[in-house]
């Protein structure tokens, strides 16, 4: 039976009030892992150690498994403890009517985001920034300016303000609202100081409540041509605060960036199972949120990193599959184990940039160095590496890319437990001139040389 109308966030809210009852433990510990395991077996999924897939038939099976995961499981609402189900026609309606391209930013700083494919010769868009990492109030502008000064960077992804007017931005407090507005206002000033006043940003990152996120759309703050973030919950879950934010974004005609980081080794399970959930999550972004693009980020449950062998494989297969069988636009976010000013951090980011570029990602978003959890440990140099490596990777043969990745990951994967902490922005840069130290430049050159030895041509 055909659907009455295209599905939207208001339909989601209504169904979240009347859907099938389920405890969160049953959802997390039974429904998600059992269905993912069942679908892996049903479709015979085996990625055979490839980072970026070369088997189109296996990719098609993965797409079918991800579609079926979303159709049969639905989405769990954590507020009502009910399951929201879509019909098959509603899902296809969303897939068939996605935004095929959009513009971020204004004036000469605007960039056009268009679909890429596996092995595409065009470099993806580089969204450089702290990626939700905590940043001190006193260096908030120079940290973001360090990204805007890099020509490899096309747009900015915001950091989190640890304080505003010296006070913590407690959720649902006046300070959260102020921080949500101030976050983007300061970043746009930083971009203007770098000579790029029309650069788009992606956020807000500081606020955790619906009122905080909605308040970020303001004079001098988030504009409709910026990427507006809303986050799904692990795995295939959402709360009603997020649905309210989605309603605002759609009513405001904002570019919507639907974000979620599937956890390898978590509720979904292993590599293939987590990738099935990742594909389902991609599709849900466009059904539930009416997203302009989906920001991915498979993360390792033990290491908290997106750059491990397992998470790179999940990211590569999920993106290549989405790229091959839909027009949905996808990005990926970067969380290395090592901190800034270290060779390991740059190599980790490079491995993910190679994977994302080769598998058809439209947007690379990072780098949240030191796992994105240490204050002020992120700089524009990591984003430069992400961009330069993407440029070197674009158009390369996938079989060669997989060989390079195997060797590259082997250089750092034994060091996760003892990853170098690195240095803060203040130690990596001259804060007044917003330029990297000679020491960091030498480390950067050393990492670049290693990548050249592995086969990348800059």
From Swiss-Prot:
EC code(s) of this entry: 2.1.1.248
UniProt pathway: One-carbon metabolism; methanogenesis from methylamine
GO biological process: one example: methanogenesis
UniProt KW keywords: Methanogenesis, Methyltransferase, Pyrrolysine, Transferase
Gene3D superfamilies reported for this sequence: Monomethylamine methyltransferase MtmB
Enzyme class, UniProt record, top EC level: transferase
Stretch forming the signal peptide: none
GO molecular function, one term: monomethylamine methyltransferase activity
Residues in coiled coil: none
Catalysed transformations (reactions): Co(I)-[methylamine-specific corrinoid protein] + methylamine + H(+) = methyl-Co(III)-[methylamine-specific corrinoid protein] + NH4(+)
UniProt xrefs under Pfam families: MtmB
UniProt subunit comment: Can form a complex with MtmC.
Protein family according to the UniProt entry: Belongs to the monomethylamine methyltransferase family.
Chain's role: Catalyzes the transfer of the methyl group from monomethylamine to the corrinoid cofactor of MtmC.
Protein name stated in the entry: Monomethylamine methyltransferase MtmB2
Annotated organism of origin: Methanosarcina acetivorans (strain ATCC 35395 / DSM 2834 / JCM 12185 / C2A)
Lineage of producing organism: Archaea, Methanobacteriati, Methanobacteriota, Stenosarchaea group, Methanomicrobia
Annotated gene: mtmB2
């Amino acid at each position: 039976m055909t659907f009455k109308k295209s599905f939207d966030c208001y339909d989601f809210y209504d169904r979240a009030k009347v859907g099938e009852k389920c405890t969160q433990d049953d959802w997390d510990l039974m429904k998600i892992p059992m269905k993912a395991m069942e679908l892996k077996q049903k479709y015979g999924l085996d990625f055979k150690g490839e980072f970026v897939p070369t088997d189109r038939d296996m990719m098609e099976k993965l797409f079918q498994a991800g579609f079926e995961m979303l159709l049969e499981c639905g989405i769990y609402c954590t507020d009502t403890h009910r399951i929201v189900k879509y019909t098959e026609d509603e899902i296809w309606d969303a897939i068939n009517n996605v935004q095929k391209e959009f513009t971020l930013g204004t004036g000469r700083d605007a960039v056009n985001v268009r679909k890429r494919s596996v092995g595409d010769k065009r470099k993806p868009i580089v969204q450089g920034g702290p990626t939700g990492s905590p940043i001190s109030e006193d260096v908030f502008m120079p940290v973001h300016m360090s990204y805007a000064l890099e020509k490899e960077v096309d747009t900015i992804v915001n950091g989190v303000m640890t304080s505003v007017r010296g006070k913590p931005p407690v959720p649902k407090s006046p300070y959260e609202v102020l921080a949500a507005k101030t976050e983007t206002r300061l970043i746009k000033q930083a971009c203007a100081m770098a000579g790029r006043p029309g650069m788009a940003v992606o956020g807000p990152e500081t606020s955790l409540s619906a009122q905080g996120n909605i308040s970020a759309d303001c004079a001098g703050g988030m504009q409709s041509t910026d990427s507006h973030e809303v986050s799904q919950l692990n795995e295939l879950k959402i709360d009603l605060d997020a649905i309210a934010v989605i309603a605002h974004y759609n009513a405001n005609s904002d570019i919507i960036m639907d974000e979620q980081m599937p956890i390898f080794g978590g509720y979904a399970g292993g590599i293939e199972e987590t990738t099935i959930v990742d594909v389902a999550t991609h599709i849900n972004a466009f059904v539930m949120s009416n997203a302009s693009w989906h920001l991915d980020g498979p993360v390792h449950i033990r290491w908290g990193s997106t750059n491990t062998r397992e998470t790179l494989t999940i990211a590569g297969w999920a993106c290549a599959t989405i790229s091959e069988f839909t027009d949905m636009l996808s990005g990926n976010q970067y969380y290395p184990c090592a901190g800034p000013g270290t060779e390991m951090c740059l190599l980790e980011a490079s491995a993910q940039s190679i994977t994302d570029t080769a598998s058809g990602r439209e947007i690379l978003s990072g780098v949240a160095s030191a796992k994105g959890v240490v204050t002020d440990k992120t700089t524009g140099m990591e984003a430069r590496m992400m961009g330069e490596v993407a440029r070197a990777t674009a158009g390369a043969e996938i079989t060669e890319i997989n060989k390079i990745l195997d060797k590259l990951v082997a250089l750092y994967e034994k060091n996760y437990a003892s990853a170098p902490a690195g240095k803060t922005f203040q130690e990596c840069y001259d804060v007044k001139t917003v330029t990297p130290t000679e020491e960091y430049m030498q480390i950067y050159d050393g990492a670049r040389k290693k990548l050249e030895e592995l086969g990348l041509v800059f």
